Amino acid sequence: MQEYDQHNLTKAVIARLADTPNARTKQIMTSLVRHLHDFAREVRLTEAEWKQGIDYLTATGQMCDDKRQEFILLSDVLGLSMLTVAMNQEKPEGCTEPTVFGPFHVEGAPHYAHGADVANGAKGEPCMVYGRVTGVDGRPVAGAVVETWQADADGHYDVQYEGLEVAQGRGVLKSGEDGRFHFRTIVAQAYPIPDDGPVGELLRATGRHPWRPAHLHFMIKAPGYETLVTHVFRRGDKYLDSDAVFGVRTSLIGDWVRQTDGTYRLDFDFVLNPTL
């Protein structure tokens, strides 16, 4: 009978994976076991720390529901979400860069006509957003589905409010024949990611703040083009260099320009990458 110890256990576990039928699953699981065991050996993980880690992951799962995804939030603050985006979504020069998806997108956002008020009662300073969707060749992309969502002036997304029965600060539009779209909303503000759960505990334990710089989320889809998931960040925000989820890219920083009537205006164009 084979006995296992700290010197031969990793090899034995990997050997058990030898008959995994899917090659990619085999590759991922083999690497995961190897790195996980190496991590435990490197830090000399104690049994109490192992139990604490199990409890932490359990609590993270218990925090998830149809309105909040604590595991995505955990992935975000560990930089894993952004690393995955950066590795898998390299774009040709000139294309709008992607960034993290975030935990507060929901299906079924209302559809709006150009110029409509997407804020729909959300608290904040009024703002107009003007955009254009093109391909890398500069040609307009007509009929692109442009979905946007954002937090309000208090740093909350609509889904974080108990009992709120209408969508606020989120909506879907379609670009016109010239690729253009515009809508009313509120000025983006910096806000803290939810820190009342396990992710917040981790941030406090490591001396990190929970703040994200002000931004608007966009997801843009069009036939013949790769789906773009990105943000537009507000220039001058003090958290641009310390985003809690590592999502800022210089090319995604935009200008919210104050108008003579006291409202604001953001102009930002999006360039999609064609599918092969």
From Swiss-Prot:
Keyword Flavoprotein: no
Inducing stimuli: Induced by 2,4,6-TCP and subject to catabolic repression by glutamate.
EC id: 1.13.11.-
Entry's transmembrane regions: none
CDD domains attached to this UniProt entry: 1_2-HQD (cd03461)
SUPFAM superfamilies, per the entry: Aromatic compound dioxygenase
GO molecular function: catechol 1,2-dioxygenase activity; ferric iron binding
Cofactor note: Binds 1 Fe(3+) ion per subunit.
Residues binding Fe cation: Y157, Y191, H215, H217
GO annotation, biological process: catabolic process; catechol-containing compound metabolic process
Cofactor: Fe(3+)
Gene inactivation effect: Disruption mutant is unable to grow on 2,4,6-TCP, but it can still transform this compound to 6-CHQ. Mutant accumulates an oxidized product of 6-CHQ.
Keyword annotations from UniProtKB, A to Z: Aromatic hydrocarbons catabolism, Dioxygenase, Iron, Metal-binding, Oxidoreductase
Pathway stated in the Swiss-Prot or TrEMBL entry: Aromatic compound metabolism; Xenobiotic degradation
Pfam families: Dioxygenase_C (PF00775), Dioxygenase_N (PF04444)
Free-text function comment from the UniProt entry: Involved in the degradation of 2,4,6-trichlorophenol (2,4,6-TCP). May catalyze the oxidation of 6-chlorohydroxyquinol (6-CHQ) to 2-chloromaleylacetate (2-CMA).
Family label: Belongs to the intradiol ring-cleavage dioxygenase family.
PANTHER family noted in UniProt: DIOXYGENASE, PUTATIVE (AFU_ORTHOLOGUE AFUA_2G02910)-RELATED, INTRADIOL RING-CLEAVAGE DIOXYGENASES DOMAIN-CONTAINING PROTEIN-RELATED
Name under which the protein is recorded: 6-chlorohydroxyquinol 1,2-dioxygenase
Underlying gene: tcpC
